[in-house]
Curated annotation (Swiss-Prot):
The keyword Ribosomal protein applies. This is Large ribosomal subunit protein bL27. Residues 1-20 are annotated as: Disordered. Belongs to the bacterial ribosomal protein bL27 family. One of its GO terms (biological process) is translation. GO terms for molecular function: structural constituent of ribosome. It comes from the Bacteria. Gene3D superfamilies: 2.40.50.100. Keywords: Ribonucleoprotein, Ribosomal protein.
């Protein structure tokens, strides 16, 4: 006979891989065309001048220059632009 009672099973013990989201190039940093600036879920940051937006809301540089973070509009939305 067993001298220990059987242990119960658990429904925990899983976790998803991190998605490596966030700002990849910060304000004042020089970037070349096509460089990813931000990976995000939804529009936390909005594309400004010379910044494109991918279908997963990734922001990337459309031309070479320096990254500029700014707040614009009545809602004070965060925009990212490329300045030369």
């Amino acid at each position: 006979m067993a001298h220990k009672k059987a242990g119960g099973s658990t429904r925990n013990g899983r976790d998803s891989h991190s998605k490596r989201l966030g700002v990849k190039c910060f304000g004042g940093e020089c970037v070349s065309s096509g460089t990813i600036i931000v990976r995000q879920r939804g529009n936390t940051f909005h594309p400004g001048k010379y910044v494109g937006c991918g279908r997963d809301y990734t922001l990337f540089a459309l031309k070479s220059g320096k990254v500029l973070f700014e707040k614009r509009g009545a809602l004070r939305r965060k925009f990212i632009s490329i300045v030369s």
